[in-house]
Amino acid sequence: MSERAWGIVFALIGILAFSFRPILIKLSYAAHPVSPVTLLFLRMTLSLPFFLAIAWWLRNQEPRLTARDWAGIAGLGFLGYYAASFLDFVGLQWVGAGVGRLILYLFPTLVLLLSFLFLKKVPTWREVVALLVSYAGIVLVVSNQVAGENRLFALGAAFVFASALCYAGYLVAGSQMVKRVGSMRFTAYSTVVATVPAVLQFILLEPLSALDLPTAVWGYAIVLATVCTVLPLFLQAEALNRIGANQFAIIGAIGPVSVAVTSALGLDEPFTWIQALGGALVIFGVLLVSLRRSP
């Protein structure tokens, strides 16, 4: 397969693995009154050994990093891995997994906007049409979950939208950094850096007894740290390197569909024929932007 084809495959697998994250977060909240601060601490520290091992393995890789490179890695790690994750964890206390993914997966539009504003990249008509089709599908997938939310829904939605904005900024800026530093090295270093504020936040805000959690929560945290963090981060970094931020972001619209299905199975969130129709629209939009025309 071509580099672009591999990029699409990596993006799809990474996004599907990553989409299980809200399910595990909601299951953790349901199993025990664990705080977002503690859950994020567990996710970051349990995944840290993997990223440290990879960072050590790649320590002599060229090119050598400059002070400016390190500053960029630190800033992007804070923005894309710490801030975006924490805001999402907080928001998911008050919104359902499906609704949360609808808001979070607004990030493709934010990516296209930021790319236009800062990188002067004008979206093609195919990207615009794909966005319209995909987001029409997303609205159908989760529309019936929006009704009947309590007053905290707006607050949770605001946190998740802020998470989407942070992630979009990471994708746009990270696409340039990845090309210089390398996707694996960039991901490992930036995630290690992002663990620092997560640990400091836990130390400052939570007692040590907050780690006295049921076995189920620890199990969810381990899966969250490995299958839903380590694996998708590297797959998505490789995809970003091969297909760019705009197409990666639009392919990411398939995430809410997988969340709607898994939410229906694991969290008893509704999944109707209207949502199935929406899923079909999302997939069509993804194919529209992912498949090249025949010459």
Positions of PLM-derived features:
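Glycine-/small-residue-enriched transmembrane alpha-helix faces in small-molecule transporters
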Residues: M1-F41, F78, E149-Q176, V196-L200
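Membrane-interface helix termini and inter-helical loops of multi-pass transporters
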Residues: I23-P33, V90-Q93, V142-F153, F202-A216, ...
